[in-house]
Design a protein with these regions (language model features):
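Short, flexible, mixed-charge acidic loops at enzyme active sites
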Residues: 6-13, 64, 68, 154, ...
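Conserved donor sugar-nucleotide recognition element shared by glycan-biosynthetic enzymes
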Residues: 29-30, 60-64, 85, 118
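A hydrophobic C-terminal alpha-helical subdomain
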Residues: 140-179
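Catalytic helix-loop patch of NAD(P)-dependent Rossmann-fold dehydrogenases
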Residues: 8-49, 54-55, 76
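Mid/C-terminal beta-alpha module of Rossmann-like enzyme folds, strongest
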Residues: 95-153, 182-192
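Flexible, glycine-rich beta-alpha linker
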Residues: 3-4, 48-66
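A conserved pocket-lining segment of Rossmann-fold NAD(P)-dependent short-chain dehydrogenase/reductase
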Residues: 69-87, 91, 95-98
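Residue-level signal for the nucleotide or nucleotide-sugar donor/cofactor binding architecture
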Residues: 24, 84-87, 116, 173-176
Length: 192
């Protein structure tokens, strides 16, 4: 479920009290499906709704891989720091395993222990690929201007994360730290 469509670079923290605001037919249909599934939950049939943030791993599709590619080729990057919730695929798999073992039901918000920062991700992969990149604050004005016209800029630079307390459960599911997961992605990507 998309809680809402980010149209600005304002800081957004999702809490357990945040009401879903689907941004279109797809998001609305997912919310309706969730509401219908909740009605089926009982002792014989457990319903689990997972609302993970961006999931990443080796050879994953989407924005994370685009960010890695950018880190390999761009000579400059805005020093525009943010916070983002992310979830490594192995951590998601462990979370699902623990939910099944414990026969849990409900709505869950798993995420890595660490919040990600777009600038730090780009720095990490640029260094790993031995690529010189300059991070300049004066480029931040272009982030602000671009965010008015391009949703992709908002997706890359907006601060948007789950309250870390939402992701604490009575079982361990973080099998790989964020830094180790980046290392694993680096060493196991087909596009090296």
């Amino acid at each position: 479920i998309v809680f809402h469509e980010s149209k600005s670079l304002t800081r957004e923290v999702i809490t357990k009290n945040t009401k879903p605001e689907p941004n279109g037919f797809y998001g609305n249909s997912k919310l309706q499906a969730e509401n219908g599934l909740h009605k089926l939950d009982d002792e014989q049939f457990r319903v689990v709704i997972l609302r993970p943030p961006m999931i990443y791993g080796p050879n994953s599709k989407g924005n994370f891989m685009r960010l890695i590619k950018l880190a390999r080729i761009t000579p400059v990057f805005p020093a525009y720091h943010n916070k983002r919730s992310m979830l490594y695929i192995d951590n998601l798999c462990e979370f699902i395993k623990q939910i099944i073992i414990r026969e849990k039901s409900g709505v869950f918000y798993p995420q890595n222990n660490e919040l990600a920062d777009t600038v730090e991700i780009v720095k990490y992969f640029a260094k790993a690929y031995n690529h010189k990149i300059f991070m300049w604050k004066w480029l931040n004005i272009f982030v602000h201007i671009g965010s008015l016209f391009l949703n992709s800029i908002n997706k890359m630079f907006a601060t948007y994360y789950y309250d870390p307390n939402m992701s604490i459960y009575p079982f361990e599911y973080i099998v790989c730290s964020q830094e180790k997961s980046f290392e694993y992605v680096l060493n196991n990507n087909e596009d090296k």
